[in-house]
Regions:
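Near-N-terminal "mature-domain entry" segment
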Residues: 1-99, 106-110
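Internal, well-folded beta-alpha domain core
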Residues: 75-224
Length: 224
């Protein structure tokens, strides 16, 4: 994780007790064990080992994430949309549970499928359920791994599809980019309703009612 400074003021963890419980569980692994349980290189494992054994500086969450989805975000344009960011955008984390854009976190590595003495989905079930239970609806723009942390009666998924001369195709990398681009537009336009989401054009992907289902919104574009 590399830090990028956007001048965000930080806020405290939403689930400090849960993270404090997980920390010693991860701290028990040595470099070689981390290689095995996380399926990473030895070089990566030594870095992860340091995450849990050495004092680390805390940064605003959105300043640390660098995956494909996050690379689509025009974060330097968000300073007039911080209230929307805080109240409408949540980052799912196996280590921290849920994060606001400016929650202060230290670098870490953990996914929901890692074999620990506890089952992470069970561990996070109640706090995550209670956190989201009063929301009217939720739009998931994350992977199935992290979406599975959420239990809510109105959880919507976005299906990005390319129409290749009548053949409907889904490309994993294109989907990741489109998720980030959709989130970026939602933030910049402060989207609040499902109807507003359906008006978005995501790099050529537009809402398709025929391919959509009750809790799955399909966005389709012609394959170039």
């Amino acid at each position: 994780m590399k830090y990028r400074d956007y001048g965000f003021h930080t806020t405290d963890l939403l689930f400090p007790k849960e993270t404090s419980y997980l920390h010693p569980l991860l701290k028990q692994y040595n470099d070689e064990q981390l290689c095995e349980v996380m399926h990473i290189s030895y070089k990566q494992a030594t870095q992860v080992y340091d995450y849990y054994h050495l004092d680390q500086r805390a940064y605003p969450a959105l300043s640390l994430y660098q995956g494909t989805v996050f690379k689509q975000l025009e974060i330097n344009k968000y300073h007039n949309h911080l209230d929307y960011l805080y109240h409408h955008v949540n980052i799912m984390s196996a280590y921290y549970g849920v994060l606001h854009y400016n929650t202060a976190i230290t670098p870490y590595r953990l996914d929901m499928t890692m074999k620990l003495p506890i089952q992470l989905y069970d561990f996070w079930y109640t706090p995550i359920y209670q956190y989201f239970e009063k929301e009217d609806f939720i739009i998931s723009l994350t992977s199935q791994e992290f979406t599975s942390m959420i239990r809510h009666p109105h959880l919507y998924f976005i299906d990005f599809i390319e129409d290749d001369h009548g053949k409907l195709k889904r490309n994993a990398m294109i989907i990741k980019k489109a998720r980030g681009q959709m989130l970026n537009l939602m933030i910049l336009n402060e989207i609040q309703t499902l109807d507003d989401i359906k008006t978005l054009n995501i790099d050529g992907f537009v809402y398709n009612e025929d391919l959509s289902h009750e809790y799955q919104l399909a966005f389709v574009r012609e394959k170039v």
